[in-house]
A protein has these predicted regions:
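Active-site neighborhoods and metal-handling regions in enzymes and metal-associated proteins
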Residues: 1-192
Length: 192
């Protein structure tokens, strides 16, 4: 913006964020249908990635499977950069490298959705490389599901995202007591 202003000082530049933000808040029936279709395609892609998961498969190969499903279902491509991580990469937040091989005993996290007529969704799933959750993985999966439900409980008009996060975190404190992944050595690994 500053570069444009310096090149064209005779023009006034206005911040359209308030107008655009307002437009993003309310969706037409047609827009909602496009978002739903993007979500359905994301679901199909993740299911195919799950079916393709096995020890020895690379993270980028799951990306390719999902991208293929996007395209054969009418998508132009990615709605955003894919997050696909196995093992410790699944817990690195926004992990984009997709270069590691999946190993037995690992979990895979995929956060990915298509661009469908300029609309997307946000779908994240986690599953075991072996195809079946072991007890510790199941415990972690149940925690994630419980936390998601706690978040949804507080999402309401007028409640800020920080308030939602704070209330859900407070709900989850008691849930964490005694959980395997809440032990100090796991928490230290997450912080590192």
């Amino acid at each position: 913006v500053q570069q444009l202003q310096s090149q064209f000082p005779q023009f006034k530049i206005n911040d359209l964020s308030p107008i655009l933000d307002g437009m993003r808040l309310i969706k037409s029936k047609e827009e909602i249908a496009l978002i739903r279709k993007a979500t359905q395609i994301a679901g199909l892609a993740i299911i195919e990635a799950m079916k393709s998961t096995a020890p020895g498969v690379y993270e980028y190969q799951l990306d390719a499977v999902a991208k293929y499903i996007f395209h054969v279902n009418g998508s132009r491509g990615d709605g955003y950069a894919s997050i696909i991580g196995g093992g410790t990469n699944a817990f690195m937040g926004h992990y984009f490298h997709k270069t590691d091989v999946l190993k037995p005993g690992d979990l895979v996290l995929m956060d990915y959705a298509p661009d469908y007529h300029y609309y997307t969704s946000d779908v994240t799933r986690i599953w075991p490389v072996n195809g079946k959750f072991d007890p510790a993985q199941k415990e972690l999966y149940n925690y994630i599901e419980t936390y998601r439900n706690a978040l949804f409980k507080y999402i309401k008009p007028g409640v800020t995202s920080d308030e939602v996060l704070d209330k859900a975190a407070a709900d989850m404190e008691a849930y964490l007591v005694g959980k395997t992944f809440a032990k100090p050595h796991y928490l230290k690994a997450v912080q590192e």
